[in-house]
Amino acid sequence: INYDIPVIVEVQKWFESCIVKNYANPIADRQIMFSDDESYRKKIVRALNDVDIDVSGYRYDEENHELYTQRMIEGKIYELSFNDESDGTKKMIAALPVILLALQEGRLVIIDELDAKLHPKLLRYVISLFKNKNVNKKGAQLLFTSHDMTTMKNTVFRRDEIWFAAENERHESEIYSLYEIRRENNERVNSTAAYDKQYLEGRYGADPYLTNMLAGGEWL
């Protein structure tokens, strides 16, 4: 069979270009972060500054395999071990290299539980990078899982951008978008609806235990 068909090759290359962020394996991220490209390193620092992580640079000690963030205080540079940073700062520093790479090259980046240990404002900032056409000039995409409710709003996402995972009767996970959900009158969920509030009310197929608790029922 001849697989050398232009459209198939193009699709294959697209899948190969996808970036899967794995916090358990930071080696690839380090290779990106410690690139010799000075302009790229400046972009990482600028992005950190944008979310109030006040660093002026960073340094990697190859001998001890340790990362240090640098801060300018009264004209002097002070260093802090990456391990001593807050969990939110560490996660942001770990995620930024692949996020910026995706934006720079127009790729898809996949991140599991992006909101974990991340302040809601930082999460919204990451999302805004991909939704801002002046920043995301090459059509990069972000696919992430989250339990965060603060971003489940019509001002942040369209209905077709929000997807739910629910267990069916065979204990299989099924996914469906908010756009697919129909109300009792067979109309779609309004694009101006309070998505977070309606989700907690169980209108989108909320977890049955959550629905029961919110209704004041017994759950133990």
Question: Each predicted region: which residue ranges?
Answer:
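Phosphate-coordinating catalytic segments in nucleotide- and nucleic-acid-processing enzymes
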Residues: 1-94, 100, 104, 195-198, ...
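C-terminal lobe/lid and adjacent interdomain/linker elements of RecA-like ASCE P-loop ATPase modules
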Residues: 71-73, 128-220
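Phosphate-binding glycine-rich loops of NTP-binding sites
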Residues: 92-93, 98, 129, 145
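Hydrophobic "anchor" residues on beta-strands that sit immediately upstream
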Residues: 108-109
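Walker B catalytic acidic pair
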Residues: 112-114
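Conserved D-loop-proximal element of ABC-family nucleotide-binding domains
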Residues: 116-120
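Conserved D-loop/post-Walker B switch-helix segment of ABC ATPase nucleotide-binding domains
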Residues: 121-128
